[in-house]
UniProtKB/Swiss-Prot annotation:
Its main location: secreted. It comes from the Eukaryota. This is Stromal cell-derived factor 2. GO terms for cellular component: endoplasmic reticulum; protein folding chaperone complex. It comes from Homo sapiens (Human). One of its GO terms (biological process) is chaperone cofactor-dependent protein refolding. Residues 21-75, 83-138, 139-193 form the MIR domain. PROSITE patterns: MIR. Residues 1-18 form the signal peptide.
Length: 211
């Protein structure tokens, strides 16, 4: 699915000049930066040659690669209404826009570091419960200028990059994997993308807090 047509939808706020509330919301399409290694979460129709054999997930330095867009959705078997703010501690799915597969993990070993494999799984946005990740952050909501961690809801590893680099056919891309221990390697930040306008509920809460 191409990213450009999303710009034609109503109720969107771009990354620049958006809401002063600055929250990340369901339905937003974003790139996620690993702040330690300065790479964006990425996938493509290239499968692992070991482990699960599923679609690989990597980190890339390119800012412009369209294969780094992910749609934020509710956890498996739930609907998260467009514009609903993501709460700290909330389970979500991240669906790769161009291939329709979800960020996924399981008890396979990653090919380079020997940590837990992270892959992209499913068809047209539908996979299984191993696609669920819990957003770890400070405060009530995931805010766009803040760093977050993603904890795999089933195996409890943290989405991480530690710098291992692939050769051909994806030369220069970094391994993305799951790690049990928190560290600077598992912080992420929302960067470029299309951010859905926060729901009226959050605006009402913010107005009430100001009174």
């Amino acid at each position: 699915m191409a990213v450009v047509p999303l710009l034609l939808l109503g109720g969107l706020w771009s990354a620049v000049g958006a809401s002063s509330l600055g929250v990340v919301t369901c339905g937003s399409v974003v790139k996620l930066l690993n702040t330690r290694h300065n790479v964006r979460l990425h996938s493509h129709d290239v499968r692992y040659g070991s482990g699960s054999g599923q679609q690989s997930v990597t980190g890339v330095t390119s800012v412009d690669d369209s294969n780094s867009y992910w749609r934020i959705r509710g956890k498996s078997a739930t609907v998260c209404e467009r514009g609903t703010p993501i709460k700290c501690g909330q389970p979500i799915r991240l669906t790769h826009v161009n291939t329709g597969r979800n960020l996924h993990s399981h008890h396979f070993t990653s090919p380079l570091s020997g940590n837990q494999e992270v892959s992209a799984f499913g068809e047209e946005g539908e996979g299984d419960y191993l696609d669920d990740w819990t957003v770890l952050c400070n405060g009530p909501y995931w805010v766009r200028d803040g760093e977050v961690r993603f904890k795999h809801s089933s195996t409890e590893v943290l989405l991480s990059v530690t710098g291992e680099q692939y050769g051909r056919p994806i030369s220069g891309q970094k391994e993305v994997h799951g790690m049990a221990q928190p560290s600077q390697n598992n912080y992420w930040k929302a960067m470029e993308g299309i951010f859905m306008k926060p729901s009226e509920l959050l605006k009402a809460e913010a107005h009430h807090a100001e009174l």
